[in-house]
Design a protein with these regions (language model features):
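Glycine-rich flexible loops
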Residues: 1-155
Length: 155
């Protein structure tokens, strides 16, 4: 569903999400944000459900910086919207992704296309990070420790 910042439906069918307050909090805190996508992506949910920040290890997600898991707040509540508002206020960079503890993911960006692309990249990174952590725990070696990327970090 596509809505404007006054909550008018622009395109699509159905009603406005119960999570509208969370979406609006992001828009209100950063004028560069023109798209907010909330999802329950399978691999990303592993990190969100466990309350873990996601290691940002794939080249395709470097421009998102830290992938932080926010403290728990029940879905659809003003408390969750305020946690999102606080994080967006503290870090104005876009694109940006947040894990919502025990709930899902939130990706903010400049356009629908770029934000959806970042959601797909986030999910790919989640799969890679999950497998990396499993391999590391099993003592499977052969890959260097994570190295900071110094390229492909901006739009």
């Amino acid at each position: 569903l596509v809505i404007d910042k006054e909550k008018n439906i622009i395109d699509g069918y159905g009603g406005i999400t119960r999570e509208i307050n969370m979406h609006m909090a992001a828009y209100e805190e950063n004028a560069k944000i023109n798209c907010v996508i909330h999802a329950h992506a399978l691999n990303s949910m592993v990190f969100a459900s466990m309350g873990l920040d996601m290691p940002n290890i794939s080249e395709g997600t470097q421009k998102m910086g830290e992938i932080k898991c926010l403290e728990f707040a029940p879905a659809t509540t003003p408390e969750l919207a305020e946690k999102v508002r606080k994080e967006v206020r503290q870090d104005q960079a876009i694109p940006k992704s947040y894990l919502l503890r025990k709930h899902g993911v939130l990706v903010v960006g400049a356009t629908l296309e770029k934000t959806y692309d970042m959601l797909e990249r986030l999910e790919w990174n989640a799969y890679i990070a999950k497998e990396y952590l499993i391999f590391k725990q099993l003592g499977i070696t052969g890959i260097d420790d994570l190295v900071e990327y110094d390229y492909n970090t901006e739009e």
